[in-house]
Amino acid sequence: MKTQLYKGSSKILYSAEEDFLLIMAFSDNVTLESGEIIEISGKGVLNNNISSFLMDKLEMNGIENHFIEKINMREQLIQYVEVFPVQVIISSVACGRFVKEFGMDEGYVFDKPIIDFKVRSREFKYPIVNEYQILNFGWLTRDEIKAVKEQALRIYDFLSGLFIGVGIRLVECKLEFGRVFNGEESIIMLTDEISPDNCRLWHINSNEKLGFELLENEPNKAFESYQLIADRLKEK
């Protein structure tokens, strides 16, 4: 019998039969900015399908990640990764905090994607943290920061092209990385998920928002947009 190891707002981690493997289950829950938890029936199934598909595509293109295989509609088998305490946010278009904090016009296209680091802490509301702080806190080494940034940009470039091919624009995404040890050596590996829960996705022609951006104000339309994204990716 599998043992629950962790329960977040949208995913649950369970033990697996083999060492260094875990089962990740996608729930229908989502936590709004207000802290309210709502349920979007069927969202977990779609996110499992979307993330499995994208992680598999990344692996085929030389990006190592924790995904091993999809087990069923809601669960996937993953490799254990010692996750870094920071998230990597890559933005190619002014959105979210760039509009709220800097007064930029939403939709302004940056010359190059911008990389931000945020602390992985809901308690402290995911504050921005810079590279000097990350180094001084001992969270990552200088070489690890460099490698994470290079991988993040490579992933973003690949995903952007893939989404453009199905008429969707990847505006911003949140990635998580960690270490996998092989004896005394370690490699950096992509972990968590890639889905409409952690990617800002807009319709390429109309800039209509898709995915999690609808959850706050138009939750009744959210599932339809998740389904649209999943259906578009099936074409690839």
From Swiss-Prot:
EC identifiers of the protein: 6.3.2.6
Pfam family, one: SAICAR_synt
Catalyzed reactions: 5-amino-1-(5-phospho-D-ribosyl)imidazole-4-carboxylate + L-aspartate + ATP = (2S)-2-[5-amino-1-(5-phospho-beta-D-ribosyl)imidazole-4-carboxamido]succinate + ADP + phosphate + 2 H(+)
Keyword Nucleotide-binding annotated: yes
Keywords, alphabetical: ATP-binding, Ligase, Nucleotide-binding, Purine biosynthesis
Gene3D superfamilies: ATP-grasp fold, B domain, Phosphorylase Kinase, domain 1
Keyword Aminoacyl-tRNA synthetase on entry: no
GO BP terms, alphabetized: 'de novo' IMP biosynthetic process; cobalamin biosynthetic process
GO CC annotations on file: cytosol
GO MF annotations in UniProt: ATP binding; phosphoribosylaminoimidazolesuccinocarboxamide synthase activity
Pathway named in the protein's UniProt entry: Purine metabolism; IMP biosynthesis via de novo pathway; 5-amino-1-(5-phospho-D-ribosyl)imidazole-4-carboxamide from 5-amino-1-(5-phospho-D-ribosyl)imidazole-4-carboxylate: step 1/2
Family of the protein in this entry: Belongs to the SAICAR synthetase family.
Protein name, as recorded: Phosphoribosylaminoimidazole-succinocarboxamide synthase
Lineage of the species this protein comes from: Bacteria, Pseudomonadati, Pseudomonadota, Alphaproteobacteria, Rickettsiales
